[in-house]
Every structure is written in C-alpha cells, then in structure tokens.
Amino acid sequence: KKMQAAGNDILNLGIGSPDIAAPKLVIDTLKETASHKEASQYQPYNGIAALRIGFSDWYRRVFDVTLDYETEILPLLGSKEAVMHIHLAFCNPGDTILVPNPGYPAYAASAKLLGLTIVYYDLEESNNWMASIDQLQQKVTRNCKILWVNYPNMPTGAVVGKKELSDLVNFAKHNNLLLVNDNPYSMVLN
C-alpha cells in the first residue's frame, strides 16, 4: 500500500477478485428465482441433499475420493467462511498455524480475529514454489495445529506432485497437524 501511495504500479496477487459481470443467463436466472416465495425461506444448515450428493459424486469422479454426503460435506458461502470454520473447529486462542507466503490473506485475517499465532513459511522460486519440509520443521512448534497449503498455488501457479504431497502428509502426521489444502483452482490450473 505504501508503494502504491508513492505512485508505483503494483499488481496485487493476494486475492483472485473477479472484475467482470456474471453472464446474462446467470443474472436472469437469479432474478427469476428470487421471485419464488421459497427463495426467502431459511435453507437447511447443511445445504440441500441434492447439492451435497452432487458434490460427493463430483469428488468421486474427479479425485477418486468417497465422501459421505450426510457427514462429510458442508456447503459454505465462500472460502473465508470455510477458513474461519476450520480455525474455530481445530484451534484455541494462542495456538499456532503455519501459513504460506505468498498466500491467501484470509488464513491470517481469520487467525488474527481468533487470537491465533501466525507463522509464515516462504514459498521460493528456487524450490519450485513448494513448501520446504526443512523450513516447516524449523517453524513448527508444540502448539501448532494447522498447516495451510494451497495447490495448485495462487499466485505462483505451482502444482504439487504426488511425492511433494506425500511429504506434506507425512510431515503433518509426524507433527500432529491438520493439513489443509485450500484447492480453489484445481479445475483451472490442473
């Protein structure tokens, strides 16, 4: 922000915020649907079953993962809500989370609201933008609860391989961490 204020042209790679309007068909459908009396009623907290079944089917087809739509899928309003829910479920004030730099600002923003300690680990070009297990080992603490990763990564575009992902899983298991791969760009960058 200081560099922008000084007149430097800065490209913000922090959040993928769309700057185009939704397609006309989507807008027209939303307008039409909003006129239904059911549209203003409260929806089930866990979403409608048809949506959760659809998500479960998609995960099976795309990732070869079986999810129970009744107990393992919770549709949310967006990633910020999901990040907050994960922090609320797995952390207490004073706990530590490991966050990539560069990375999604919502990880730290949510953590700050909840009184968590944020420890950043660097994603470096010399390591193909992958999390370094050696660096993570130096940063992990006794009260560390979550390791956030983001692959395919934004803003770097790095795609994690099976070996690197296996290394991250083993590191998380060894250190009793919840490993969260925030994966919003899986269908765009893979």
Question: How should these model regions be labeled?
Answer:
Residues 89-111:
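Conserved PLP-anchoring active-site segment centered on the Schiff-base-forming lysine
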Residues 1-78, 85:
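N-terminal small-domain helix-loop-helix segment of the aminotransferase-like
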Residues 6, 114, 174-175:
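Helix C-cap/helix->beta junction micro-motif
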Residues 67-73, 93-96, 143:
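Short acidic capping loops at alpha-helix termini that bridge into adjacent secondary structure
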Residues 95, 115-119:
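Structural loop-to-beta junction motif characteristic of Rossmann-like glycosyltransferase folds
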Residues 119, 123-190:
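Active-site phosphate-binding strand-loop segment of PLP-dependent enzymes
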Residues 18, 80, 104, 151-155:
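Short glycine-rich anion-binding loops that position phosphate/pyrophosphate groups of nucleotides
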